[in-house]
């Protein structure tokens, strides 16, 4: 397997945690210290990578674990 290619899809379920915490995307972005545009890219799954420091800040702001917001779905072959 090439290092740049995944055999599946990594999905960010930030919307679910935002709803549970009654928090807006803008409020989360401010707490994390990134732009709303960049948070939107993460939320929509268009990001190619995420820094651990950003993931840490998101988890702290949402009071959750990484597994609460990240899901892996394998490709069906």
Where in the sequence are the language-model features?
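DNA major-groove recognition helix of helix-turn-helix
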Residues: 43, 54, 73
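Residues within the helices of the helix-turn-helix
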Residues: 15, 26, 56
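Short, basic-rich loop-to-helix N-cap that marks the start of a DNA-contacting helix
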Residues: 46-57
């Amino acid at each position: 397997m090439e290092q740049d290619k995944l055999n599946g899809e990594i999905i960010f379920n930030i919307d679910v945690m935002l709803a549970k915490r009654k928090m807006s995307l803008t409020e989360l972005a401010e707490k994390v210290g990134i732009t709303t545009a960049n948070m939107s890219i993460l939320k929509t799954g268009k990001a190619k990578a995420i820094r651990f420091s950003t993931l840490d800040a998101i988890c702290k702001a949402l009071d959750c674990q990484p597994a609460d917001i990240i899901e892996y779905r394998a490709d069906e072959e």
